[in-house]
Each structure stands twice: as structure tokens, then as C-alpha cells.
A protein has these predicted regions:
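Zn-dependent metallopeptidase/amidohydrolase metal-coordination segment
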Residues: 5, 10-13, 337, 344-360, ...
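Fold-level recognition of mixed alpha/beta catalytic cores in primary-metabolism enzymes, strongest
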Residues: 136-226, 234, 238
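Active-site-adjacent substrate-binding region
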Residues: 223-248, 402-445
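Active-site metal-coordination/substrate-binding segment of hydrolases
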Residues: 66-164, 190, 199-202, 315-318, ...
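Acidic-enriched catalytic cores of C-N bond-cleaving enzymes acting on peptides and small amides
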Residues: 196-200, 219-249, 268-346, 380
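Acidic/His- and Gly-rich active-site-bordering loop/insert found
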Residues: 3-105
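His/Asp/Glu-rich mid-to-C-terminal helical/loop segments that flank catalytic regions of hydrolases
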Residues: 159, 223-240, 270-273, 317-326, ...
């Protein structure tokens, strides 16, 4: 293929990233990339395992002289979050990612880049492909459906893994090692809708321009959530009059902070719609001022169309929807004030979708403390009961606790110091990592999560610092050499 990324070493690392990016691999659509990995292994005579959900393990024997060193697992996920700007035409089920290189930064043309976690795939393929590297026996574990709830890692038969040292490659800041993470669960509220025929003038509200972001890593940044802003506007309009809601749709991923939301209301006549439009514009002005520092790109258009005939939600259905969005917890719920103020409990209202007969709200609560996670789930169930929603709790995953003693952490700290002359920062994150599932299943697992610098993951602004990826590969190879000694 004609490679776009040039001038960075090793060239093969970036070539593999481009090859991976050419394969559609949204969550739930990983067969193509999984089969690519199997073919890669077979072409090189490496042992390979593929399961029914397309997880892949590729095993490579230790390099000469390192046969007695403990086996090391390298791990990352092969799926990506699929999100795009509304103006971009892109079919994630059939189209590869259109890469853009500018000033040392890699992005995509109006879509998510997929460096989360495509760079991990490329890193492992490069290590497996290069027989000059000194390393212990390797088990490269490629998991599926991480972005929808760590599904592949949960499903994987852990007896296939002999390693008790794990290097997870799904961290997003160079110079930082993650050593513990939050657990979480996907919560889906559903409620039936009753519709009734309405005529009059429609008022369409369309929110865009918000930064969005990862609902764990970015939840503390006070960014706007399109679903909540829309609910705020409609709540005020319902106090001022009685609009009927035709539709309310925002977000596609529970684990992404919502950037865009669109709602359609219907009023009896143009005058009523015009009065409501002015109220909406006043609230939009307030929100714009409130988000000036944290989310300055926020916009919301207001349009009126006359002579409409629609099937709108009845008042009871509309009230249930807006009350749920106004009352459901969102954002930072609790911080660890005893240490660094890091987030301990949070929630994100990522998706609101109305169909002909149902409304669905998807939330992503997280906590680094199991008891608080359980208590928060109880609160969400109580709220659902009060509002008349059905609540479903799915894809729950455990947190990963900090280990006082960690040889692999010590090796990374020493290697980073000697290579770059500075200290590796050790952190915990408020997001789910597959490390928690592996640590739960593999007794005595010594794990660390690392990676090059990525920005704005899960959004169309996602980017990767190419020089950072270059340096990170140097660090990884040095660590493997030390672990082989």
C-alpha cells in the first residue's frame, strides 16, 4: 500500500498502523482485523489462538539466551470507537480510516482515528515481526469489544495465558504509567412511549460543537453534555408552555461525553413556536457563557417550520423523559480528597434515543471502590423505579487495585529514567482497563498500562503524536530486553 506516515522509526511500526487502520474494526465488527492477525502469525510460523468472539493470542518464543526468563504478556484491544462529524460521509462497517499527517501529528479526516487502541496492535505486530529484538517469551493478547464493556477480555479463556507479567498498551500519555483503574457498568433505562397526532409548527433544536471526550478520563474537565443541555432547554420550555416532544436523540456511545443532540418539538401555531424559540435562545446564551472556558465551541441552532403533521409523545411520556435526564446523576460524584483529588465515582449520560414506541437512556457509571459502585447502582435503580423506567445493568467489569510491590513497574521506572533522563509518572485512572479482568483471573499478575501520547480519544479530534509513538517503542524494546535478562 502507499504509506502516508514517513520519516519515523521504526518504519514498520507506522506501516503496521496504517495497515490496521485500513481494516474496518468498530466494536462488534472485528472479524476482519482478527483474521488479519491470524494470517500474520501463520505467515511467520508463530503459534496463534483465535476464539469464537475473535480474540487472538499470538505466542513468540524467547530470543536466544532468554529462554529462562518469565513469559511476558503484551496486550491491547483491536476494536475502536466509531464517531464522526455530522458533515462527514463515512461508513465504519466498510471504510478504512482516512489518515491525515500534519506537523508530526496523526489524525483522521473527520472521524475517530482509532489509535485507541490501534497503536497497541501495531506495537505488538512490530515486536512479533522483528527477530533482532531481545525479549522473553511473549504472549501477545489482542482482545475484542473493549469499547463496549471489555467484552472480549471478559470472554477470553484465561487458561490460555501462562504469563504473570502484563504490559497493557492502552494508556494515552507518554511518560505516565497507569497502575490501577476504576470499575464500571453500562446502565440502560427504557420506558414505553405513547404518541398522539399533532398539527402545528415544529421547533427544532440542534446542539453541536461540544468537545466531548472519554467519559472516564475527561469527566473531570467540566465539558458540556449535549443531552443535559437539551433537557435543560426543554424543561424550561415545558414550564413556559406545553410543547409536545416529537424526537430527542443524542450520542451513540455510553462511554463518550455527548457532543451533539437534536430534538424536535411541536407547538399549536407559529406564534407559540416563536415565543418558545426566544426562550430557548436565552438559555442557549446562558449555556454559551457558562461553557466559555471549558467548552467554547458550543452552538445550538433553532429552527421553526410551519404546517407540520407529526406523531408526538404524549405529555406523560415527555415528562418521564425530561425528568429522568434532569435527575439522573452526571459528572463527578465523589473525589478522593484525602490524596490528590482524583475522581472516585462518576456517571455519564452518553446516549438518549427515541423511537416510535420507546425512549432509551444509556449511562456509564464508574468507581474505583467496589462498595461505592454497588451503592451507586442502587441509587440508579431507585431513580428508575420512581420514574417508571426499566433499568438494565450490563457489561460490568472490575477495578484494578494498586500493588505496593511491582517488579514490572520498577523496570519501567528505571528504563525511562536511563533513556530519557526524567522520572516516569505513576498514576491511577478513572476509566476501565482490561487489566482489571486479567488481574482478577490470573492470580499474582504483575501489571502496568503504558502507551504513547494520544489526545481527544473517542472523538473526531482524536490524534496521535508520532514522535511520542517513536519514543515509546524505544522504551518498550528496552523494557523487554531488561525483562529478558
Amino acid at each position: 500500500m502507499d504509506y502516508k506516515i514517513t520519516g519515523y522509526e521504526p518504519a514498520q511500526l507506522f506501516h503496521f498502523f496504517e495497515e490496521v487502520s485500513a481494516i474496518p474494526r468498530g466494536s462488534g465488527n472485528e472479524k476482519g482485523i482478527s483474521d488479519f492477525l491470524v494470517a500474520f502469525a501463520k505467515e511467520r510460523g508463530l503459534d496463534v489462538y483465535q476464539d469464537e468472539v475473535y480474540n487472538v493470542i499470538i505466542r513468540k518464543p524467547a530470543s536466544a539466551g532468554a529462554e529462562n526468563a518469565p513469559t511476558v504478556m503484551l496486550q491491547g484491544h483491536i476494536d475502536m470507537v466509531c464517531d464522526k462529524l455530522g458533515s462527514v460521509e463515512h461508513d465504519f462497517t466498510t471504510d478504512g480510516i482516512d489518515l491525515v499527517v500534519k506537523d508530526g501529528v496523526l489524525t483522521a479526516n473527520g472521524t475517530t482515528l482509532g489509535a485507541d487502541n490501534g497503536i497497541a496492535v501495531a506495537l505488538m505486530l512490530t515486536v512479533l515481526d522483528d527477530d533482532s529484538i531481545v525479549h522473553p517469551a511473549l504472549e501477545c493478547v489482542f482482545t475484542t469489544d473493549e469499547e463496549t464493556g471489555l467484552v472480549g477480555a471478559e470472554t477470553l479463556d484465561k487458561s490460555q495465558i501462562s504469563a504473570r507479567t502484563m504490559i497493557n498498551l492502552d494508556s494515552e500519555e507518554e511518560g505516565v504509567a497507569t497502575v490501577s483503574c476504576a470499575g464500571g457498568v453500562v446502565v440502560t433505562y427504557t420506558c414505553p412511549i405513547v404518541r398522539e397526532h399533532k398539527t402545528g409548527s415544529t421547533l427544532t433544536l440542534d446542539i453541536s460543537g461540544l468537545l466531548g471526550g472519554h467519559s472516564g478520563n475527561d469527566i473531570n474537565l467540566e465539558r458540556g453534555n449535549g443531552n443535559l443541555i437539551m433537557a435543560r432547554i426543554i424543561d424550561r420550555l415545558m414550564v413556559a408552555g406545553e410543547p409536545a416532544i416529537v424526537s430527542f436523540n443524542g450520542g451513540t456511545k455510553d462511554n463518550a461525553i455527548n457532543r451533539e443532540c437534536k430534538a424536535e418539538l411541536v407547538y399549536a401555531d407559529h406564534a407559540a413556536a416563536e415565543a418558545a424559540a426566544q426562550i430557548a435562545k436565552d438559555i442557549i446564551a446562558d449555556v454559551t457563557a457558562e461553557l466559555e472556558v471549558f467548552d467554547p465551541g458550543f452552538t445550538c441552532t433553532v429552527e421553526i417550520a410551519d404546517d407540520a403533521e407529526v406523531e408526538a409523545m404524549d405529555q406523560k411520556s415527555a415528562l418521564a423523559l425530561i425528568r429522568a435526564l434532569r435527575l439522573a446523576p452526571n459528572g463527578v460524584i465523589r473525589r478522593n480528597v484525602a490524596t490528590d483529588g482524583s475522581v472516585e465515582v462518576s456517571s455519564n449520560i452518553g446516549v438518549v434515543a427515541t423511537s416510535d414506541d420507546e425512549v432509551k437512556i444509556m449511562l456509564s457509571p464508574r468507581s474505583s471502590i467496589t462498595s461505592l459502585q454497588n451503592e451507586f447502582k442502587d441509587r440508579l435503580q431507585t431513580l428508575a423505579d420512581v420514574l417508571g423506567f426499566d433499568a438494565k445493568f450490563e457489561f460490568e467489569y472490575p477495578g484494578w487495585s494498586y500493588a505496593e510491590h511491582s517488579p514490572v513497574r520498577d523496570v519501567f521506572v528505571e528504563s525511562y529514567r536511563e533513556l530519557f533522563g526524567s522520572e516516569l509518572r505513576i498514576e491511577s485512572i478513572h476509566a476501565g482497563l482490561e487489566c482489571g479482568l486479567f488481574a482478577e483471573a490470573l492470580h499474582g499478575l504483575d501489571a502496568i498500562a503504558v502507551g504513547p501520547t494520544l489526545s481527544d480519544v473517542h472523538t473526531p479530534d482524536e490524534s496521535m503524536d508520532l514522535a511520542s509513538a517513536e519514543r515509546f517503542y524505544e522504551l518498550l524494546i528496552d523494557v523487554l530486553k531488561r525483562l529478558a535478562a
